[in-house]
């Protein structure tokens, strides 16, 4: 007679309950996480521009901050909700290093009515190569004495 078979159904029941509870908790939190900036962002980097688009529909414009320090772009959102029944806080932060050929003086942002944050900057014009002529130094003449 083995005790292994005696305890095995109880073990299955405990882990089954645990897994079911974890799945239920995940289903409850999924709507909160859906649409967060981490899930829906797009970066465009081509010859004409650098752009990033984020879905920030869960944040008000006053909850968002965009900072530029050199070529480092920081995007932050923070929202707090206090009620008589509880407190909740949502936040996100993105730090993006802009390419060297981006015109950082022309970075602009736009927030659409449906909560799409768009940040764009044009690329600098490429410096055209040119030919540099070689100038010859004057030849010193030797004088004979």
Curated annotation (Swiss-Prot):
Concerning what turns on (or off) its expression, the entry says:
By heat stress.
Keywords, in A-Z order? Stress response
User: Among its keywords, does the record have Signal?
Assistant: no
Q: Name one GO molecular function term.
A: unfolded protein binding
Q: Which residues are connected by disulfide bridges in this protein?
A: none
Q: Which GO terms describe its cellular component?
A: cytoplasm; Golgi medial cisterna; nucleus
Q: Which domain of life is it from?
A: Eukaryota
Annotated GO biological process: defense response to Gram-negative bacterium; endoplasmic reticulum unfolded protein response; IRE1-mediated unfolded protein response; protein refolding; response to heat
Stored CDD domains: metazoan_ACD
Similarity annotation: Belongs to the small heat shock protein (HSP20) family.
Indicate what this protein is called per its UniProt record.
Answer: Heat shock protein Hsp-16.1/Hsp-16.11
The species is Caenorhabditis elegans
Lineage of source species: Eukaryota, Metazoa, Ecdysozoa, Nematoda, Chromadorea
Which gene is this protein's source?
hsp-16.1
């Amino acid at each position: 007679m083995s005790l292994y078979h005696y305890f095995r159904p109880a073990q299955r029941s405990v882990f089954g309950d645990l897994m079911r509870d974890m799945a239920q908790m995940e289903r409850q939190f999924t709507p909160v996480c859906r649409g967060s900036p981490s899930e829906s962002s797009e970066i465009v980097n081509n010859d004409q521009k650098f752009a990033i688009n984020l879905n920030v529909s869960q944040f008000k414009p006053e909850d968002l901050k965009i900072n530029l320090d050199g070529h480092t772009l920081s995007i932050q959102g923070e929202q707090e909700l206090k009620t008589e029944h509880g407190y909740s806080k949502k936040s996100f932060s993105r730090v993006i290093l802009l390419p060297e050929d981006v015109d950082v003086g022309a970075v602009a942002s736009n927030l659409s009515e449906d909560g799409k944050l768009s940040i764009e900057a044009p690329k600098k014009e490429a410096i055209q190569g040119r030919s540099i002529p070689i100038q010859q130094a004057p030849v010193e003449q030797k004088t004979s004495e």
